[in-house]
Curated annotation (Swiss-Prot):
Purpose of the protein: Forms part of the ribosomal stalk which helps the ribosome interact with GTP-bound translation factors.
Domain of life: Bacteria
Name recorded for this polypeptide: Large ribosomal subunit protein uL11
The UniProt record lists the keyword Ribosomal protein: yes
Family recorded in the similarity comment: Belongs to the universal ribosomal protein uL11 family.
This protein's GO CC annotations: cytosolic large ribosomal subunit
Subunit structure comment from the entry: Part of the ribosomal stalk of the 50S ribosomal subunit. Interacts with L10 and the large rRNA to form the base of the stalk. L10 forms an elongated spine to which L12 dimers bind in a sequential fashion forming a multimeric L10(L12)X complex.
Modification(s) after translation: One or more lysine residues are methylated.
SMART domains: RL11
Lineage: Bacteria, Pseudomonadati, Pseudomonadota, Gammaproteobacteria, Lysobacterales
InterPro entries reported for this sequence: Ribosomal_uL11, Ribosomal_uL11_bac-typ, Ribosomal_uL11_C, Ribosomal_uL11_C_sf, Ribosomal_uL11_CS, Ribosomal_uL11_N, Ribosomal_uL11_N_sf
Keyword RNA-binding: yes
NCBIfam families, per database record: L11_bact
Amino acid sequence: MAKKVIAYIKLQVKAGQASPSPPVGPALGQRGLNIMDFCKAFNAATQKVEQGLPIPVVITAYSDRTFTFITKTPPASILLKKIVGIQSGSKRPNTEKVGKVTRKQLEDIAKTKELDMTAADLDAAVRTIAGSARSMGLVVEG
């Protein structure tokens, strides 16, 4: 018989740095899941990813207190900030521009995020990422 799903828990945890402290501990503790098992498994799964990069994770909690999890790619805004080398986006994106991003850089991000995006093709994914860049106050070139 299939296990009964009791909850889906969505978190953003830094790659290789999962620990029992918030937000991981309280979210898993409420469901009665073993926090250290998750931390060890997550840190092992994100070992090849750049350390400290926030990774979205969806944890499926089952009624027998077991869990599975799926890691996703980092948010586009984080990847854009990393490429451009800024700490945060513009507070007024339509008037204050904080950096420039090229079509090639957008394509690289779109290829990275391809699995998590619902875009029909690479061009649609690039347009989506370009929209995120503009809303952060970045100038899209090309």
